[in-house]
Amino acid sequence: EAAGLLPFPRL
């Protein structure tokens, strides 16, 4: 997913 765009990693 867009992990780099979020302020936290979606697990």
Swiss-Prot record:
GO terms for cellular component: extracellular region. Its main location: secreted. GO terms for biological process: neuropeptide signaling pathway. It is found in: Secreted. It comes from the Eukaryota. Keywords: Amidation, Neuropeptide, Secreted. The modification Leucine amide is found at residue 11. Mediates visceral muscle contractile activity (myotropic activity). Belongs to the periviscerokinin family. This is CAPA-Periviscerokinin-1.
